[in-house]
Structure formats: C-alpha cells, structure tokens
Amino acid sequence: MHTKVYNLSLVTGAFALAAAFALSASAEGMKGPKTPYDLAKERLGSADPSHQKVYGGKDAPPGAFPFQVSLLQAEAKKGDEFNYHFCGGSLIADTWVLTAGHCVTSEGEILDPTRINVYVGSTDFKNGDRIAVKSVYRHPQYNADFTDNDVALLKLERAPKKEVKVGKINLIDATKDSTLETPGTDLTIVGWGTTEQGSLSRTLRYTSVKIVDRTECNNNILQNRATSLDDSLSGIVRSFRIPDDKVSAIRQSILDNAGQIVNENMICAGDPKPDPAAQFVHDTCQGDSGGPLVAKSSDKATQVGIVSWGEGCGVPKLHGVYTRLGKFMDWVKSTATN
C-alpha cells in the first residue's frame, strides 16, 4: 500500500494563486456574470424591487439632471416603462448616449440594438420621450471578468422631440483627469430606484459621494472577498493537514496575489468616514449602472465617471467603483462621430 505524499508548498501555492484569481475576478461561468439586462429579465413578475437603489438619496426636482436617461427593455408597453428599466446613461449629443459596457451585454454578447430603448426628458417616467437604438458600441477591450474598460455608446435612431426638456452633459477633459486622484473630492451620483428602506420610487434620485483612495478601496474589497474563502480554506486545511501556523500565511498570500482589482481605469467613491452607527452609506446599486458620476462647478455639470460595480450596496467601507471616463475620452470622441 502506497501513501500519497503532498508537497505542502506546492499545494498551498497553487491554492493561493487559484483563490487569488477568484478574489479578483467576478465571472460566473463561461458566459460571464449576469448583467443588468439579464437580471431585469429575471426580475419581471417579482415582488422584490431591490434591484436598483441610490442609498441615502433625495428626489431630484424636475429638470435637475436633464442629461440623465433610462435604458429600457424594448418590449416595455407604453406607460409601463419604469418596470422595464435596467440601466442608466447620459445624453452626450443629440443622438448619442454614454453608458457602461456591462449594460449592453447579455450572456456574454453585445445586446442587439433592437432590444434596447432609451427614455429621456423625465425624472418620473411620465411625459418623456422613448427612442429606439440604432447601434450599440462597446469598448473593444471590455473585460467582463474584471469589469474593466466598462464603457459603451448607444447611437439613437433620432434626436429627442423638441417639446421634451433634455440637456447634454459636458464630458471631462482628459488633461484634467489627474484631479480625480484627490481623496475627498465631492461628486454626485444619480439614478432611479427604491430607497434604502426598500419602498419603490419612480422618481430620479441623487446623492453626494467623495473620492476614496484607490489603494484603500482595493484593500477593503479584497479583505471582504477573502472572508468568503474561509470555508474553502478550512476544507483545504483538513484535506492536506496543513499546520495551523501556515493558514494565516496562505490567506495573506491570496491577498498579495489578487493584485489591484480597482485599477487606474476606475474611480472609487463613497463615504470615506461613515458614521459608525450607520446601517448604510451613500452609494449606487445595480439598477443605477451606466449612469453618470458628476462633478459640479459654478453650476456646470461635468461627467467624470460611469456607475460600474461594487460589493453589495450601501455597505460601510465597501465603496462604489466607477469607470474613469478621462481614460476613455479618445475612444468616446472617435466613436461618437456623427
């Protein structure tokens, strides 16, 4: 009878590397993670409205954010548009909408434009203008596993009707992108959805957030993900009889190998110093994806980011992550050409 002998360093090293990838990636199978469009399909008919939230937000007055748009599933019946909302976006030209790459993705593929409508000119899904989409452009380096290069453009079939009040948002000058490295900078997030109490709201909501140091943000997210691996670690310890003094070293190795999941293409924003007694902090959630992260100066709104991803919603120290628009302005300008 032969006794199987395991090389402890190889076992722990291989597990650490595999677990590190699991920490940094977000894939759910070969077709990638479920996207807002997929989740909205599943949600229809459900009594749970918690798919979309701006935590700690206020109702936006009519006309306050005239550039904000809603992405709808095209099969929505007239008058029922809100229930088919799955992402946000921003009007950047008469016939161009900026949104997130994951908003135009379903089962790993780019959505056909016939499956999307855009609703403009309303904060409450009343008396707005519903427009068909002609073309969908997702960034060529979009990475679903890491939600990287998370940006897309929609070419509309026509401009909004003249009687509908809309406005185009200014986009960040790429040469001024370095200002977004300063923690504490005030920004605004906008989106539709339920309040933090879970009551459904058809009114556009907004709240303020601050830029958070990217390294701090990254570390908080990794530590949160690492806790979910504790059960797996326990199983490995039992199977391979790893000494207790090695377990903490394995855990640290996992974190070290996971790298920067919040990279230079992203902005982290939230409540840097939340009230210790707070049950939630100002944040966006899934249904707000694709909407704008806005800087305001002298009553001028400038879009600096796009709602992209996060760990949960409104969780203290787990801040929202946004596409850093300044890194993609060359692509935006070259794509939205007419």
Which ranges hold each PLM region?
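Extracellular/periplasmic catalytic domains that process cell-envelope and extracellular macromolecules
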Residues: D59-A64, L91-I92, I110-D112, D124-R130, ...
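Active-site-proximal beta-strands of protease catalytic cores
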Residues: W96-G101, L180-T195, V294-G312
